[in-house]
A protein has these predicted regions:
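Small-residue hotspots at the loop-to-helix junctions and early N-terminal turns
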Residues: 34-42, 123-127, 158
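Intracellular helix-loop hinge segments at the cytoplasmic ends of transmembrane helices
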Residues: 24, 107-117
Length: 192
């Protein structure tokens, strides 16, 4: 269970490194008017909504650990694209939507892994997962802010996010190799 918490705390830090600085990224780098930020946040939120469904669908169709690794891998690439193309308004909007999708799609498969690993402690596992997401929030926001303190632009937190998501990907791969019983495809089953 601690290994899964580490995957979440590090891998989801990539989301928060990007999302914590989305407003200055959009206004300072992409050059959107501040009045457009609520609409951009709705776009990201709509992507997150779709991501929840995508993650659940993927967890049903393949092994949850594999789904998590694939999604973290794609998230790494997309965060690098955010870093590279944030000066283009249309690319920035499209990547915000895709980041929204990817950021939430990993949640379902990784939660399934945790619940399966918990064995009769599912409620406690769910609480630990929430704590891991909170750790990811603080780690991502903190590490994403370091380049800003050093004088780099607002696209750099996305690069930090890519490294964190890559850490989540590596941990998923190691998890799949080390804990094979928890990485098998899930048949629909009652959890609680």
């Amino acid at each position: 269970a601690l290994y899964i918490i580490a995957i979440v705390a590090i891998g989801f830090g990539g989301l928060f490194a990007w999302f914590s600085y989305i407003t200055p990224l959009m206004t300072e780098v992409s050059k959107f008017e501040p009045s457009k930020i609520p609409s951009i946040m709705i776009l990201a939120g709509f992507g997150m909504l779709i991501g929840n469904f995508l993650g659940g669908w993927m967890a049903d169709k393949m092994r949850p650990a594999l789904a998590s690794a694939i999604l973290f891998g794609i998230f790494v690439v997309v965060l690098i694209l955010v870093f590279s193309f944030s000066e283009n308004k249309m690319a920035s909007l499209a990547l915000t939507f895709v980041c929204g999708i990817l950021s939430m799609s990993v949640g379902s498969p990784i939660n399934i892994i945790m619940i399966r690993a918990a064995k009769k402690s599912e409620m406690l596992a769910a609480a630990f997962m929430q704590a891991a997401f909170n750790i990811a929030n603080s780690v991502g926001a903190y590490l994403g802010g370091i380049p800003l303190i050093k004088g780099y632009g607002y696209q750099y937190p996305s690069l930090v996010g890519a490294f964190l998501a890559f850490g989540g990907l590596l941990l998923c791969v190691v998890f799949m190799l080390k804990f094979k019983p928890f990485t098998q495809k899930v048949e629909n089953e009652d959890v609680l």
